[in-house]
């Protein structure tokens, strides 16, 4: 057990200091989990200082560790061994969600470690998963508008250094979030996606699956020299979201404006918040009426196809949670509500349960990952069909990013509305849920509506 009390200090700066500090030294602050949208889901932003230990899984499944000793097994076995709670739950006077632990990235292809029968094509990325042990971080509490420096192990020198860097960053003007110029923008051929939708519908008609989420790619090249922090700031301004993030690790970056939560663990309470059902939003900064918003959301929640897809996926999430929860504890406590973001409306539900005493946070990840809303039902067969139809690795897209606290709590998003960047090259994916009565052209337009929010971060050169 860790016995030295954490150090937590309020710093006289505003929340923009976290983004300024991240932009100044992305290698020193590799992970920024950012509540970039207003609302009840957006309470805390976390900026992680350089890790004291790490576990990395490469694109072929090989493991590398720094300052920890690998145990037999795969990435999740090692994460489970090293991320076990070392502090009692709720053991901080400020009631912060996270005061130290592991920041974790899971690429979509990690699913093959959970379900060995899956043969997924590797993604074009240097790593497929990593976990970073962090003992120092900055926290922005949006409810009170306080910025806090946190040093879990109570190291006074590390704490004073973090406070000084935040104060210095607070003197600077926040980074420029203006759109970035593009030299090139390529979109996957629309006809190919239409054919994939028809093929998925054939699988549904044959009884292989009930629903599948198919995605397509956009590839961009920047005209100017813009690092990941600048790209993230432009994305954040164009498409704010409650589970946004910027990660830079070993020369590769992922930049997310995700609206979706995979799981939240607080004590023994666990929840997942599936999104299924989307409409392009006609009310934007450029114009539109609130009356149009109301009409669009009403049509969305009443549409038979959207309702059927959503109900099917609620059942999938209930079953997944039931694998790690106490019998009879899994409930749907929010049912088919609408959430509106800058460019789309979504149907959202919340499913919660009571985590069994013998189940860890990593056990919960094994049960839920990847999220059913971005695979389909039944999950494993859908993933086999997705791999066959898409023909390429997804990487960060529909993976997950979040944290495992040293008190056992956890919070993970689903990496939708997410860019990956290596130098000037950027890639993004967007998908749509396919069911028996899907209209291929309408599903194509849904992928474009989802991509549009991200593409607003860029302008033609």
Task: Give names to the regions the model predicted.
Residues 1-461:
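Extended alpha-helical targeting/anchoring segments
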């Amino acid at each position: 057990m860790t016995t030295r009390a954490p150090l937590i200090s309020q710093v006289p700066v505003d929340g923009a200091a976290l983004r300024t500090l991240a932009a100044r030294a992305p290698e020193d602050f590799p992970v920024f989990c950012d509540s970039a949208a207003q609302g009840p889901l957006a309470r805390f932003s976390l900026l992680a200082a350089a890790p004291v230990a790490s576990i990395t899984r490469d694109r072929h499944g090989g493991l590398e560790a720094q300052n920890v000793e690998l145990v037999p097994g795969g990435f999740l076995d090692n994460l489970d061994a090293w991320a076990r709670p070392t502090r009692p739950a709720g053991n901080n006077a400020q009631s912060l969600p996270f005061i130290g632990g592991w920041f974790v990235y899971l690429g979509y292809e990690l699913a093959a470690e959970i379900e060995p029968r899956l043969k997924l094509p590797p993604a074009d990325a240097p790593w497929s998963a990593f976990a970073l042990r962090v003992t120092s971080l900055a926290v922005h509490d949006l409810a009170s508008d306080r910025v806090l420096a946190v040093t879990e192990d109570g190291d006074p020198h590390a704490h004073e250094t973090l406070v000084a860097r935040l104060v210095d960053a607070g003197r600077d003007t926040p980074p420029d979030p203006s759109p970035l110029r593009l030299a090139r923008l390529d979109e996957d051929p629309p006809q190919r996606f239409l054919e994939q939708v028809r093929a998925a519908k054939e699988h549904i008609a044959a009884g292989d699956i009930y629903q599948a989420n198919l995605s397509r790619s956009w590839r961009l090249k920047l005209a100017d020299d813009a690092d990941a922090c600048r790209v993230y700031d432009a994305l954040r301004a164009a498409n704010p979201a409650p589970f946004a993030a910027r990660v830079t690790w070993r020369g590769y970056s992922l930049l997310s404006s995700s609206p979706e939560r995979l799981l939240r663990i607080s004590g023994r309470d666990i929840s997942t918040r599936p999104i299924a059902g989307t409409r392009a939003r006609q009310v934007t900064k450029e114009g539109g009426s609130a009356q149009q918003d109301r009409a669009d959301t009403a049509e969305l929640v009443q549409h038979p196809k959207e309702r059927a897809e959503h109900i099917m996926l609620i059942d999938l999430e209930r079953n997944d949670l039931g694998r790690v929860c106490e019998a009879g504890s899994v409930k749907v406590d929010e049912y088919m509500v609408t959430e509106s973001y800058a460019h789309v409306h979504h149907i959202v539900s919340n499913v919660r349960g009571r985590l069994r005493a013998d189940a860890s946070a990593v056990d919960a990840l094994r049960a839920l990952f990847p999220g059913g809303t971005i695979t389909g039902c039944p999950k494993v067969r859908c993933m086999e069909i997705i791999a066959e139809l898409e023909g390429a690795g997804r990487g960060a897209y529909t993976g997950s990013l979040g944290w495992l606290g040293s008190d056992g709590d956890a919070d993970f998003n689903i990496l939708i509305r997410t860019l990956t960047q290596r130098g000037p090259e950027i890639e993004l994916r967007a998908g749509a849920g396919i069911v028996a009565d899907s209209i291929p052209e309408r599903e194509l337009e849904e992928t474009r509506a989802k991509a549009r929010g991200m593409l607003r971060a860029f302008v033609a050169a």
